[in-house]
Amino acid sequence: SDGSDVAEMYDDFVYTPTNGLLGAYWGQNYAIIYQCNEILDAIAEKETAGQTETEDIINKGEASFFRAYCYFNLVRAFGEVPLVTYKINDASEANIPKTTADKIYEQIDKDLKTAEESLPETWSSEYTGRLTWGAARSLHARTYMMRNDWNNMYTASTDVIKKGLYNLKTPYNEIFTDDGENNGGSIFELQCTATAALPQSTVIGSQFCEVQGVRGAGQWDLGWGWHMATEYMAQAYEQGDPRKNSTLLYFRHSDSDPITPENTNEPYGESPVSPAMGAYFNKKAYTDPALRKEYTNKGFWVNIRLIRYADVLLMGAESANEKGIPGEAIDYLEQVRARARGTNSNILPKVTTTDQGELREAIRHERRVELGLEFDRFYDLVRWGIAKEVLHAAGKTNYQDKNTLLPLPQTEIDKSKGVLVQNPDYQ
């Protein structure tokens, strides 16, 4: 089974501490953290012995980045979690109580500062996809954003903007295509591939498309159909916004349904068939049929775009507005809207209001449509303090205040023999 019932459980906010995916998410993040700890401890020993080389400095930056990235995943999802920053020689050494979220963020700040100081601004094409200063600084901005720390969020995001390393030259409808990989607006992108020898490998590829692909049969068995969009989301787009058709994948419910322009998707002219109950699949996980035939329907070769320059511009806009610098906020916002608008001057007019409240709503709207189905909408609602209001309006009435965090995996609590304490209201 691919766990369609599990997807519905999370979508309806009725998950429990015993759900297996909680343990998997927790365990995978900590596995990476422990690997980073080993690398950093080994480099520290070389530093003490005065034997560090240039590659050690870069490796230190990369390991620090990934440790921060994983702790950010954990603190956003679970809140207080154990903070382990040393090599684990025995499992008992990791059996420690939860650390406050503030302390976790202190470690994240420390690690990202190390990454920023250690990583280069660019790499040669031979090393496409390796971590850079821009990735570290952009992730730092995102962590400040989650804390609504406007001053540090502004400094970090505008540091990246002012460097001029990234651009929005790639049209929006090409960003998530095969040709759009590692484009000028991609700051942090996981590199995945497929080969004739390993056409369906998750070792060198990813499940990004498989998890979100069309849930159908035969040629339309493209994935599990998780992370579907709603009509509520479709209605959020302004009239004529081309990002709608680049984000929402239209489909028919059966082969007997007619193929119409409204359910046909560019650029491949396909009208998938699925019995799914959601309104739209994620078009950002939609793959080229020619590559499906060569490798597999599941799209393991597709890179995962994790931080885009448009996101950084919107972080700059949001923090500038909150700091009372509307002109700068409008400029960053307009750069994002201008790329989406393209040559069609009749759509997406420039936002000109300098009223802080109105501009705040415009920026929030832009985050929703520019970054639609890219993982962070829920966390935006949480940090803005409007999650319950928005989710209830969308029909998700099971959502309660406790759902700002996930429950700790019951398996981890059991293994700790009571050292770990469950999050409030899940006990």
Predicted feature descriptions by range:
Residues 2-78, 93, 99-102, 112, ...:
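Conserved, well-structured interaction surfaces
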Residues 4-11, 235-309:
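Flexible, polar/acidic helix-loop-strand segments at domain edges
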Residues 29-32, 107, 117, 176-231, ...:
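Long, intrinsically disordered, low-complexity segments
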